[in-house]
Amino acid sequence: MATNQTDSSTDRLTHPLLEKLAPLPAAAPHLFAYSAKIVCGRQGETGCCCAAGVRPGVYATEVNIQNLNLVTAPVLKFVLPLINSGAVVAREPDVADPATLRGHQTDVVKLPPLAATMDDCCRVAEMVLGAVPSGDAPLTIAILTIVSAFELSVSVVYTANPPGGDGISIDVEYLQPRLLGLRGQG
């Protein structure tokens, strides 16, 4: 006699970190994911860490997230540090693995309809270190990953100053979402 069996893995999200977004609408076939490069802090003239082509200067990044939906959007954010306060922590063959994140490196925020929030260098430092450092922070390079069941508007503002303070560079990028398949899909 045949029975109606259910495989519990079909109900489980494909990565344990995504469980923080649960419960998701049953009909949701995928999640929207955004990957923002973060460059923060001071890179000195005598580079501390062979910083992969980062020139001397002061760097800042701000990530803006807006929920352009008419429902509240749960948003999962996590930081994958590559260079942490001047120390290279994820140069190949080493990797920044989301499965090994500490609690303060992840955050879930519920964005009301049409609401916005931002993550800047202070917030990224708090997520990576557990607290905001005082004074000038050494170079930190990381990936801020943003995941939601709803499509969001995500922009990133990068600023850089040379060591002498002569001039400033500002760049704004708008991030397109990547689709993450749920429950074994894509």
Would you name each region that the model predicts?
Residues 2-186:
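Gly/Pro-rich, tryptophan- and cysteine-flecked surface segments typical
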